[in-house]
Amino acid sequence: MDTRIKRIIAREILDSRGNPTVEVDITLNNGIRGRAACPSGASTGIHEAVERRDGEKRFGGKGVQGAVQAVMDIISPKLLGRDALEQKSIDSVMIELDGTPNKAKLGANAILTVSMAVARAAANSEDVLLSEYLGPKSTLMPVPCMNIMNGGAHANWQGSDFQEYMIAPVGAPDYPEAVRWGCEVYHSLKSVLKKKGLSTGVGDEGGFAPIVPSNLEPASLIVHAIEEAGYIPGKDIALVLDPASSGFYKDGKYTLKTEKKVLTSEEMTDYYEDMIRTYPIISIEDGLAEDDWEGFAFMTKRLGNTIQIVGDDIFVTNPERIHRGLKEKTANAVLIKLNQIGTVTETIDAIRLAQKAGWGTMVSHRSGETCDSFIADLTVALGCGQLKTGAPCRGERVEKYNQLLRINEFLGDKARYAGRQAFNSA
């Protein structure tokens, strides 16, 4: 079978927020095709690889025709005739073509989408699942961390200061049951909110986004919903937080508008410690801001033996920044987002670097998503054990959970559910 690249086509499509994004189709000489679409974040770290947007009147400046043309006019001529099975070589060519440290010239949205489409075309050509192609011996199914209450930028700052309140069915016996448990709690929470006269409208990621009096209230509501659904908080289902603290960090302080508090890094750590004592929290992501290295190290030293401390914006899936984090003991886990670094190869390198050091790895969607389920396969392939991809609501979120159900079915008796052990220090 001739797996050399014959044709590359890029186009502008819409993401889940109605904003343009890049989609790429790759056809190999054997006639096999691969398609991929790029996600986009709402709360983006300043150190992330750069999305290329047109900045013109159409789509309010968010068009991606320039990124599409970069694929067609610059990337495609250099990749035609190359073997799709040589992922690392293809990604290296695109990185060299761009020539910037953050992919600002061609755009991470152009480069990544091609990189993903190449991997999918290669997997299709080998007639295997993408997860099997990227990780032939991997059988670990992840804990689905479902974002069932939204705040911060994901809810237009109408509710909690904290961006995501997730549930993690750590006590489930397998992945399909974990999904069922999560769905039942999600529907239970909707009933709880209705009874309290709170809004059941959903945010970008499918979670509910009611106006609440404090950042603790969503956790209380979720614990109530877990109990109403017939599960034991902490034992069956734990809580996972992503405050996305860079969004309320300014001049060295953290401003919690919901509670009219202005706190230092140490005081924020105290705040989280109090939350952990009250609620069954197993993991906190971006509890402090993206450049608060000293604060992160303090928080990890203080809380890292009790819960998982995840770095997202501080690491941006970048091996160089993860290296620094390992040296300074900044966290004990890293969030993985494909479009933060911009190629499949670099993403895999970041995951393996963290795993080799004993850190936890949680793969993540973005708030502006498509129905591409690449991250579901990636999570299993690399044995990450944790995936967050929104609530069990909205098609672009549910598609990832559904793809994992298919992978679990394919693995059969070989499938192993990660459970509580996936979370560092939990």
Swiss-Prot record:
Q: Look up and give the organism this protein is from.
A: Methanospirillum hungatei JF-1 (strain ATCC 27890 / DSM 864 / NBRC 100397 / JF-1)
The UniProt entry, under InterPro entries, shows:
Enolase (IPR000941), Enolase-like_C_sf (IPR036849), Enolase-like_N (IPR029017), Enolase_C (IPR020810), Enolase_CS (IPR020809), Enolase_N (IPR020811)
Give the residues the record marks as binding Mg(2+).
Answer: 242, 285, 312
This protein's major location comes to: cytoplasm
Q: Which reaction does it catalyse?
A: (2R)-2-phosphoglycerate = phosphoenolpyruvate + H2O
* Record PROSITE patterns: ENOLASE
Could you say which protein family the record assigns here?
Answer: Belongs to the enolase family.
Q: Which cofactors does the annotated protein need, by name? A: Mg(2+)
Q: Write the protein's name.
A: Enolase 2
One function term, GO molecular function aspect = magnesium ion binding
